[in-house]
């Protein structure tokens, strides 16, 4: 009788270390690089950190977005127009 594996190619086994997934460290923004308000120097929320904060608290008060402007909640100064965000 013929061997059942006759003519079959041998499969190479891959090492488990080569197929393991690499985890990259999370992106951390240093404290010095945070955007601040030009008037009161309070730190502003970065768009990458929006998911960490409850935006509904800020949107319900109406102090952040007023007349298509983004305003600083601490001092009320106008930061930029919403239409300018798409250009940057």
UniProtKB/Swiss-Prot annotation:
Pfam families, per database record: DUF678
Give the start-end ranges of region Disordered. 1-28
Matching InterPro entries, A to Z?
Poxvirus_A19
Recorded family membership = Belongs to the chordopoxvirinae A19 family.
Query: What is this protein's name?
Result: Protein A19 homolog
Give the species: Fowlpox virus (strain NVSL)
Classification from the root reads: Viruses, Varidnaviria, Bamfordvirae, Nucleocytoviricota, Pokkesviricetes
